[in-house]
Amino acid sequence: MAQFWKPGTEKPRLLDDEEGGVLFLSSSFSSSSSGYGYASIEKQRQRLPVYKYRTSILYLVESHATTIVVGETGSGKTTQIPQYLKEAGWADGGRVIACTQPRRLAVQAVASRVAEEMGVKVGEEVGYTIRFEDISNPDATRIKFLTDGVLLREMMEDPLLTKYSVIMVDEAHERSISTDILLGLLKKIQKRRPELRLVISSATIEAKAMSDFFQSSKRRRVSEGEELRPRLEPAILSVEGRGFNVQIHYVEDPVQDYVQAAVSTVLLIHDQEPAGDILVFLTGQDDIDVAVKMLTEEARSDGKHSSGLIILPLYSGLSRAEQDLVFSPTPKGKRKVVISTNIAETSLTLEGIVYVVDSGFSKQRFYNPISDIENLVVAPISKASARQRAGRAGRLRPGKCYRLYSEEYFVNEMSAQGIPEIQRSNLVSCVIQLKALGIDNILGFDWPASPSPESMIRALEVLYSLGVLDDDAKLTSPVGFQVAEIPLSIWFSGRGVQRELDEAKLRFAAAEGDHVTFLNIYKGFLQSGKSSQWCHRNFINYHAMKKVMEIREQLKRIALRLGIVLKSCERDTQLVRKAVTAGFFANACRLEAFSHSGMYKTIRGFQEVYIHPSSVLFRVNPKWVIYHSLVSTDRQYMRNVISIDPSWLTEAAPHFYQQQRLNPIIH
């Protein structure tokens, strides 16, 4: 069990087993209220730390092409700066203020909050757009929240983003691929649209490095009215937070099971500490669901430890109703426990959090261009992330952060900053986006952090093999442009259902593999009349199925607009398998001869991989398969697997799989 102590104090004694097995250092804690109490929305806005910088922000935006705002989470920069800009006239004359977020859930939450503060309905003066969902009005929306990726897609129709007067790139420190592409393109747009203002906002970003990136290296030609143009040199403004002191506690020894340790820590906080909500950081939906189940079972079996707990998950796949529960006030006499991914680090502000439990891990993608394998792995977080997590505990009053790792590890081993996603990901989707936007010299593109040439070259090779690029590395017509228009990863072929439960697999499992199983579930949902009761009986997520329907209809409209003729495969599942092969041919694997453990090897790179236990093909072990994604734990596991005929590989990608090379493997 985890044993916590506060640095600089004497090592505490061990508890007896009957006391719970997890040791906390008792420390003074003021349970007095924050003093905020009830206030009007306008009063609440004025109490935010960013309010006293309102005039400075508006002056800098007026006088500089780019303004970099560094502000702690909870300072109010995300919700207030777009409103300040609108109040100053930047949305007059039909212009729009854009604010991008790296995550869909954050887009929805922030748009709802700003609309509430302005006293308007979401979708009118304040709107948002995420993939497959547009809640905005072209004639009425003046403040628009959207993901970085959606704004990139808008560039395909309007390369200079002419309707926007100010574009605010929020949470820029997360350095997603879409964020880095967007920053590079916005820098180019500014040269054509000097009137465009950029606001780069972040909690932890290295402001000097970002300023250097936007600093123009070329002197602008002086012309009439030059004195009215904004300065090219970026302005930097640091906004204070309103945080209280947060006591940091570490474990003495590394924990063996961070999910179990997190659950134990929550129970002891609830048993020993004053009122206040708890925020737990875990790695993903699987870990979160396990922790929610463990805490819920504890609440049912042990009233002493867990009465009054409200246990809520928080990750990107939640329905809107489930999200609303997380943001709703905690009832009197209750304690809310929010178990979240790193989405709660900076993108979202949760009121009432006094205690944070930090596992020290998050899920990240890592790509090896040599083996051509991209893994979603559980990886250690950076010091910057750890500080952000701890800061969530001190928003309204003094708080505590319990880190499930040692102080020595934090000081001596944890990296200072995370690796930008562009430097650790498969770049196929990135390259096709740039090509569609007219950026042909992708190796010479102005990146905030340059990706490896090897990853770029591998992406070009794959796109050429798919028939998306021609011999001159330009998009083919019409296929290349059609693929670029569809708002999905080039590898994505539709999972159908997020929660792969054993009961559903027994009813709908297909011998061909997971993709056909998902298709069976989809057909069953339609035949039931899209019934929520049917979903409940079959252990299927009804909200996920509704989203599948919405996405299918939008993709259908896009296909018709692009002139793609849609044909049903009827009952011929071989066509489905061939379609998956055509899109995922680079992910082909062959079962190792005489393997008793179900070991496969990838055709490109000869990496050892195994079918994930959640797949309907687990322990079936067809000779040849294609997977959608890899997950690394003790082994590399294939998710969403389908069986194939190896001859389809050379049919689908003759440039990628040379017949003479593949024949010896097949036979």
Residues covered by each model-derived region:
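Short, surface-exposed, low-complexity cationic segments
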Residues: 614-635
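Mobile, glycine-enriched helix-loop/loop "lid" segments at the mouths of ligand-binding/catalytic clefts
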Residues: 364-365, 514-515, 522
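Extended, well-ordered protein cores
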Residues: 16-17, 640-642
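N-terminal leader/propeptide and maturation segments of large enzyme subunits in energy/redox metabolism
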Residues: 524-543
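P-loop NTPase motor module signature
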Residues: 1-486, 537, 543-552, 556-582, ...
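Leucine-rich, amphipathic alpha-helical/linker segments
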Residues: 487-503, 507-518
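Short, charged, solvent-exposed linker or helix-capping segments at domain edges/interfaces
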Residues: 258, 637-638
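Terminal-proximal interaction/regulatory segments of ATP-powered molecular machines
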Residues: 601-604, 609-610
